[in-house]
Structure formats: C-alpha cells, structure tokens
C-alpha cells in the first residue's frame, strides 16, 4: 500500500487534492518558499521495497507557483539581475496621492485589527511539470529542511549504520557531509535559516 500526500482545504469548501499520485510511497511533506512549494520524500527513484525489504528515498520539491519555479532555476548572476530589476521597478512605481495615504494611515491608527493576510493562489494544474529532485543520491532518509531562500537542503541519510547530517547546495550542485552519527529526529530551521534544531531521542 503506497502513501500519497493530500492538500486539504480547512474550510471544507474545496475537495481534497492528491498532490503526488506517484504509485509509490510519498511522505514527510513540508511547506517551502513561503507556501509556494513543498518538499517531501519519495521512494520513486531509489531502491524500492517491492519485496518488503525496505526502500531508499530521495527528497523532492514541488512548485505551486511559476515565478518561484523559474527563480529556483536561476544561477547567481541571473538572481542578482532579477533582484536589481525588481528593486528598480519598485522605486520607479508611481506613488499614491499623499492625502489619500494620509487618510488611510489615520484610519489604520484607529483600529487595532491586524492587516488581512493575502491568500496564496496555488497553481495545482501544472504541479507535475514543476517537480525537482533535490538529493543527489538515494538513501535511507530521515528528516530534511529547506532554507527560506531555497538554496540549501539539509537532510539525514543512513549509509553506514547510523544517520548522518548532509548538506546539498542547490546553487553550486555540491553535496557535503556535515556530521557523522548525528542521530535521527525531526529538524527545524530558525527564521534566518542559519541554525538547525533537532528533536532526537
């Protein structure tokens, strides 16, 4: 019996969507890139458990946003150019009428309500065309976390009897062993993405 990953509308107004539909086991999903993508592990490419002897997995990234997908595939020079262009466009954008802005600010000060969060619009129709394999090698995987910028993946993998902590630099296409025998457990990144916290028994 394979496991899939589902997207559930908490309001109950939309049907449940099977995001993976791979026919293999897809587990351990996490939101990534401010909700514009998700990472998860799957045994679709590794050593498969057809005979119930266990399986090897990889981590994948599925995009629900075209801009995020295209940005992920940019190199350093392209990213720098895109950021410069975006900053210039923002600077040159026409400003709103000062009086209208002043009235809005005065109105905002009268209420303690938090500003409404703009809901994400997920492009689910094209999700299967925007899947990226993140890990360079299949293995018996533990948990994994993707940095906020989407440039590095930290993951646990077992090769020689215990979980090791690895880093996959997705910009430089380099894999690096960080710590041997790090132990298994759930991992979390801080907001800046420069510290990993592991909950391990």
What function would you assign to each model-found segment?
Residues 101-104, 132, 163-201:
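Intrinsically disordered, Ser/Thr/Pro/Gly-rich linkers and terminal tails that flank
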Residues 10-11, 32, 147, 170:
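Short, acidic, Ser/Thr-enriched surface-loop or helix-capping motifs
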């Amino acid at each position: 019996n394979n496991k899939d990953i589902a997207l559930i509308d908490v309001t109950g107004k939309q049907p449940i969507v099977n995001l993976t539909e791979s026919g293999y086991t897809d587990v351990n999903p996490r939101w990534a890139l401010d909700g514009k993508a998700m990472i998860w592990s799957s045994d679709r490419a590794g050593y498969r458990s057809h005979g119930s002897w266990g399986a090897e997995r990889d981590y994948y990234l599925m995009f629900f946003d075209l801009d995020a997908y295209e940005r992920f595939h940019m190199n350093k020079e392209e990213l720098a150019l895109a950021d410069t262009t975006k900053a210039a466009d923002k600077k040159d954008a026409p400003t709103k009428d000062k009086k209208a802005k002043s009235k809005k600010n005065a109105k905002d000060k009268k209420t303690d309500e938090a500003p409404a969060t703009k809901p994400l619009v997920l492009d689910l129709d094209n999700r299967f065309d925007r899947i990226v394999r993140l890990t360079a090698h299949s293995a018996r995987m533990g948990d994994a976390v993707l940095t906020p910028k989407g440039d590095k993946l930290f993951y646990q993998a077992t090769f020689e009897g215990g979980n090791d902590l690895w880093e996959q630099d997705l910009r430089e296409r380099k894999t690096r062993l960080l710590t041997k025998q790090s132990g298994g457990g759930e991992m979390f990144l801080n907001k800046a993405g420069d510290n990993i916290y592991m909950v391990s028994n």
